[in-house]
UniProtKB/Swiss-Prot annotation:
Its EC number is 1.2.1.50. Transmembrane segments: none annotated. InterPro entries: Ald_DH/histidinol_DH, Ald_DH_C, Ald_DH_N, CoA_reduct_LuxC. It comes from the Bacteria. The keyword Oxidoreductase applies. Keywords: Luminescence, NADP, Oxidoreductase. This is Long-chain acyl-protein thioester reductase. Signal peptide: none annotated.
Length: 477
């Protein structure tokens, strides 16, 4: 089986018929057209979205989202088929991914709130706002490169939407492990209106990291901001080849875990933990890989967790695993058993629970494997937090998180959520300890003239006169 994905350059669909890159998914193949110097020139010379106001942008995204909301939308149906056929997603998981794309695009209020909380105002990109002794306005950085990872398809959607919400041109490098999501999103914009400035502002490309990346490096040298997702090698490549004067937003590998503090409702606690383990099969930075349990219902909780992991295998089945992934999963089980750890696993390798002392962890194969650690008190967890490495801590009960959030945050945790909510990034929250939209705009200040008196100095700022009369200190508050 073979699928062809054409280039998208400034919203134009281009098939080159030559120099196509090939990505293999076992016996299935995806062929993607390569870009050349002409395409590079076209992208570099393209305008941004300066003439669009925020209402125009969000209304267009909403219109696109309404298409994704329809289960009869051909682009959505093709996308779901690709996730199942090529990436091994279960039908339920693939459908959920498409549903989330619809949800994100259609959530107009959330999009406005994201701009408001991250940039300070929904109007700051459309007009000059008085702030202190200045007028301030946010302008797009310009050309933004989005180097996507394939472990979490929605991260690519999020990255592109951040670029659009800040009125930037988006040049997207698809991931070899998911060449479908960014491409389908861009094509859905074209479906709505091929001549819309948003459609024309997006390019979707691909190049293998192992190939000659000279042209890709040249393209990167023209960027005004780079958003890099993925492993350390991908992040290092982006930093190495980006211009030294621009921002590189780095979303690298992170680890997350769950803290259970004397849970009273074991049914609810186990449901939340199972969700945080099973969503994306632990391939996301926010996925729970370890559970720290404080309380006297430890054995009962484990039984409930087994029940909920089996439930999730029905409602959100695990994606198809490669031979290597299956082998690593089995080897981890054998290694832990040989080391004397207690292992609870499912005959078909659909999930695995490993019990160990806090801090004891062998290989982690992901794929719905979780280490469970019995602790005396929640304060003991602080020592296992690694600054710049620990992203999300899921708490149950949520009220317990208020007691420990200061200590956990001071140690380096970047995000604290209720158990069962790790995949939902609330509007207003930070992402990897930053406000990404702030780094995708240029804040320009138009400062008041000399005769504008300040709160501290109630006279006109006549600096030449101050020097002539040597009266500077008179005006120091």
């Amino acid at each position: 089986m073979e699928k062809h994905l054409p280039l998208i350059v400034n919203g134009q669909i281009i098939s080159t018929e030559e120099n196509r890159f090939e990505i293999s998914f076992e016996e299935k193949k995806v062929k993607i057209d390569s870009f050349n110097n002409l395409h590079l020139t076209q992208m570099v010379n393209h305008d941004y979205l300066n003439d669009l106001n925020i209402n125009n942008i969000i209304n267009f995204l909403y219109t696109t989202g309404q298409r994704w909301k329809s289960e009869e939308y051909s682009r959505r149906r093709a996308y779901i088929r690709s996730l199942i056929t090529y990436l091994g997603y279960s039908p339920q998981m693939a459908k959920l991914e498409a549903n989330w794309i619809a949800m994100i695009l259609c959530s107009k209020s959330a999009l406005y709130d994201i701009i408001d909380t991250e940039l300070g105002s929904t109007h700051i990109q459309d007009e000059w706002l008085p702030q202190g002794e200045c007028y301030v306005r946010a302008f797009p950085k310009g050309r933004t490169m989005h180097l996507l990872a394939g472990n979490v398809p929605l991260s690519g959607v999020t990255s592109i939407l951040r670029g659009i919400l800040t009125r930037n041109q988006c040049i997207v490098r698809m991931s070899a492990s998911d060449p479908f999501t960014a491409h389908a999103l861009a094509m859905s914009f074209i479906d709505v209106d091929p001549n819309h400035p948003i459609s024309r502002s997006i390019s979707v490309l691909y190049w293998p990291h192992a190939s000659d990346t000279t042209l890709a490096e040249e393209l990167l040298s023209h960027m005004d901001a780079v958003v890099a997702w993925g492993g350390r090698d991908a992040i290092d490549w982006a930093v190495k080849h980006s211009p030294s004067h621009i921002d590189v937003l780095k979303f690298g590998p992170k680890k997350s875990f769950t803290v259970l503090d004397h849970p009273a409702d074991l049914e609810e606690a186990a449901s939340g933990v199972a969700h945080d383990i099973c969503f994306y099969d632990q391939n996301a930075c926010f996925s729970t890989q370890n559970i720290y349990f404080s309380g006297d219902k430890y054995e009962e909780f484990k039984l409930k967790l087994v029940e909920k992991l089996n439930l999730y295998q029905e409602v959100l089945p695990k994606s198809k695993q490669s031979f290597d992934d299956e082998a690593l999963f089995s080897m981890t089980r054998l290694e832990c058993q040989f080391s004397g750890l207690k292992v609870i696993s499912e005959p078909e390798n659909n999930w695995m629970i490993i019990e160990s002392e806090p801090g004891v962890e062998y290989n982690h194969p992901l794929s719905r494997c979780v280490y469970v650690h019995k602790i005396n008190k929640v304060d003991d967890v602080v020592q296992y937090i690694e600054k710049h490495q620990t992203q999300t801590i899921s708490f149950y009960p949520w009220e317990s998180s208020k007691k420990y959030r200061d200590a956990f945050a001071a140690k380096g945790v970047e995000r604290i959520v209720e158990s069962g909510m790790n995949n939902i990034f609330r509007a207003g929250g930070a992402h990897d300890a930053m406000r990404p939209l702030q780094r995708l705009v240029r804040f320009v200040s138009h400062e008041r003239p000399y005769n504008f008196t300040t709160k501290d100095v109630s006279v006109e700022i006549e600096q030449t006169r101050f020097l002539e009369e040597d009266k500077f200190l008179v005006f120091v508050p």
